[in-house]
């Protein structure tokens, strides 16, 4: 009996000692040069840049979920488009005089070329493997009907021929030609309907989740990189030496520990705004966010999937904001082809698909509530659009699909809830608050913390966005000969523009296509098309893209 009692006592002491040791370990402060908050494509891309630029720097990545790339980067939570403005009509607005503005389209395309170069470089280094697992050639098409829309697309096509980035685009108003390009879109359509389409063969479908997983897997091979899953940031505090102490909660065992970091990047998607506010930096006070979700109709029926190989983008209906642009897309997800149609906007107060219903309320402060109200009043068309989308029935969504796929059958499609996107609202001296397009890097004056806010065009421009972040927070290092040489090795066109330089454009497209296993044929002479007669239009307000 005494032996049993002694044994039980020893076990109890051992367990208590183990528990005490665990608590002591939890209270220890870990030190790291760079802390990456969020396990998505932005953090993975920044970490990959820094691994080449400063291989000795230690890095820690924390992710709230139990695996990386499960929120916006997940292939099922976005449209998987390699956004390069080849088909997205909202990137080429019509000016008041009737002309077509291509400046934004050129900027979007230039940005995507940087991403292609970044990925190609990582393939050559062995960081990314099997390019077909994350990027595939899928032609990009614009498709419209009705005389005014046809005139617009014709004028858009003509305007884009001024840029070397859009060489190789084809234009047609012929039913049979368009049917050859996109059978699903044309079969069963009224043969008298006036239609037009453009097609660019070098479009891409991209699985950003797969890219993220492969980049992080490569980072994990280094001993000075640490990945902490099921880990949630609870607090950020600036220290006297300009470093940051970040409090992390382990969601599995309930322990809490601190990480002391010289630089913090908040790449947490929709959660970035709340964490930026938690940091207390003055720059955060200018921002608010408004969440918009998206749904897609999905078909995995081989009869549908094998009959469509393109991403086909339409034009927003009259009175609808550009964010409502519908598209029917070939996707390659989980190793197989599917077809998606949408997006249909949804509303939730969550900032993440796996977020909290309190996200919107908890991010609203005395400094950003007025800008939010001003934006609501100034963008009433957007408010009406969101309300109408939330009210859509199953029949309404199917009717929208049939506009792009006249012979669609309900039984071939199911509804899928994609990710959440937080649109940026920024304080404005004149208007009180404005809805900001695109993404924005927000950092403190010392360059010790930075966050990425916004949604469009999202993951497809992760490489140029993180390049911009490097220039903003590591300006002195970026200008050094060492960093300059490394950055130009990663992105050969770094520091120059491809637009207007045919030889440079073709060289980079040929290089990235070969490495990434993509289709690329030297462009032929542009199609000759009749000149479009566009009527002058009242100037349009820019509206944020849903970025799905």
From Swiss-Prot:
Q: Which domain of life is it from?
A: Bacteria
Q: Which reaction does it catalyse?
A: (S)-malate + a quinone = a quinol + oxaloacetate
Question: Any keyword Oxidoreductase?
Answer: yes
Pathway listed = Carbohydrate metabolism; tricarboxylic acid cycle; oxaloacetate from (S)-malate (quinone route): step 1/1
List residues traversing the bilayer: none
Keywords for the protein's UniProt record, in alphabetical order: FAD, Flavoprotein, Oxidoreductase, Tricarboxylic acid cycle
The enzyme's first-digit EC class, named in words, is: oxidoreductase
Recorded GO terms, molecular function? 2-hydroxyglutarate dehydrogenase activity; L-malate dehydrogenase (quinone) activity
Per the UniProt entry, the disulfide pairs are: none
Instruction: Tell me a GO biological process for this protein.
Output: tricarboxylic acid cycle
Cite the residue spans of the region called Disordered.
522-548
Locate the compositionally biased regions of type Basic and acidic residues: 539-548
Is Flavoprotein given among the entry's keywords?
yes
E.C. no? 1.1.5.4
What cofactors are annotated for this protein?
FAD
As for family, the record states: Belongs to the MQO family.
Instruction: Name the NCBIfam families on file.
Output: mal_quin_oxido (TIGR01320), PRK05257.1-1 (NF003603), PRK05257.1-4 (NF003605), PRK05257.2-1 (NF003606), PRK05257.2-4 (NF003608), PRK05257.3-2 (NF003611), PRK13339.1 (NF009875)
What protein name does the entry list?
Answer: Probable malate:quinone oxidoreductase
Organism expressing this protein natively: Escherichia fergusonii (strain ATCC 35469 / DSM 13698 / CCUG 18766 / IAM 14443 / JCM 21226 / LMG 7866 / NBRC 102419 / NCTC 12128 / CDC 0568-73)
> By which gene is this protein encoded?
mqo
């Amino acid at each position: 009996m005494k032996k049993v009692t002694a044994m039980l006592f020893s076990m109890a002491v051992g367990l208590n000692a183990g528990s005490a040791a665990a608590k002591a370990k939890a209270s220890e402060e870990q030190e790291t040069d760079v802390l990456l908050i969020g396990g998505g494509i932005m953090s993975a891309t920044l970490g990959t840049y820094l691994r080449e630029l400063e291989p000795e720097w230690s890095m820690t990545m924390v992710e709230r979920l139990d695996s990386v790339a499960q929120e916006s980067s997940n292939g099922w939570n976005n449209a998987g488009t390699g956004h390069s403005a080849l088909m997205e009509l909202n990137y080429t607005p019509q000016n008041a005089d009737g002309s077509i503005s291509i400046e934004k389209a050129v900027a979007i395309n230039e940005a995507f070329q940087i991403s292609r170069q970044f990925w190609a470089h990582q393939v050559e280094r062995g960081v990314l493997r099997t390019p077909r697992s994350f990027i595939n050639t899928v032609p990009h098409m614009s498709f419209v009907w009705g005389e005014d829309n046809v005139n617009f697309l014709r004028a858009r096509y003509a305007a884009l021929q001024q840029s070397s980035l859009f060489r190789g685009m084809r234009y047609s108003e012929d039913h049979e030609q368009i049917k050859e390009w996109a059978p699903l879109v044309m079969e069963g359509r009224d043969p008298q309907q006036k239609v037009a389409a453009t097609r660019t063969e070098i479009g891409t479908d991209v699985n950003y989740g797969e890219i993220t997983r492969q980049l992080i897997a490569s980072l994990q091979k280094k001993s000075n990189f640490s990945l902490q899953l099921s880990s949630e940031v609870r607090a950020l505090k600036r220290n006297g030496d300009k470093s940051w102490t970040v409090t992390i909660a382990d969601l599995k065992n309930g322990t809490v520990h601190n990480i002391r970091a010289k630089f913090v990047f908040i790449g947490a998607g929709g959660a970035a705004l709340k964490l930026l506010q938690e940091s207390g930096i003055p720059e955060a006070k200018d921002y608010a966010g408004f969440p918009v979700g998206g749904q897609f109709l999905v078909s995995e029926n081989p009869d549908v999937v094998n009959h469509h190989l393109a991403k086909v983008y339409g034009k927003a209906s009259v009175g609808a904001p550009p964010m409502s642009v519908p598209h029917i897309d070939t996707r390659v997800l989980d190793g197989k082809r599917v077809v998606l149609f949408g997006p249909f906007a949804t509303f939730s107060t969550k900032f993440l698909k796996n977020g909290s219903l309190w996200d919107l309320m908890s991010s609203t402060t005395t400094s950003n509530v007025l800008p939010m109200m001003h934006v609501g009043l100034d963008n009433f068309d957007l408010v009406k659009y969101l309300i109408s989308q939330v009210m859509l029935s199953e029949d309404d969504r199917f009717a929208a699909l049939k506009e792009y796929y006249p012979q669609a059958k309900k039984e071939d499609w199911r509804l899928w809830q994609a990710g959440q996107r937080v649109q940026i609202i920024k304080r404005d001296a004149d208007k009180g608050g404005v809805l900001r397009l695109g993404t924005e890097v927000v950092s403190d004056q010392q360059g010790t913390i930075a966050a990425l806010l916004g949604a469009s065009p999202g993951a497809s421009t992760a490489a140029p966005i993180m390049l911009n972040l490097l220039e903003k927070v590591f300006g002195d290092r970026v200008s050094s000969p060492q960093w300059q040489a490394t950055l130009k090795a990663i992105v050969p066109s770094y520091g120059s523009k491809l637009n207007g330089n045919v030889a440079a454009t073709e060289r980079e497209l040929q290089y990235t296509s070969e490495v990434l296993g993509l289709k690329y044929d030297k462009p032929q002479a542009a199609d000759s098309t009749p000149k479009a007669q566009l009527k002058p239009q009242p100037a349009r307000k820019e509206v944020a893209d849903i970025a799905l």
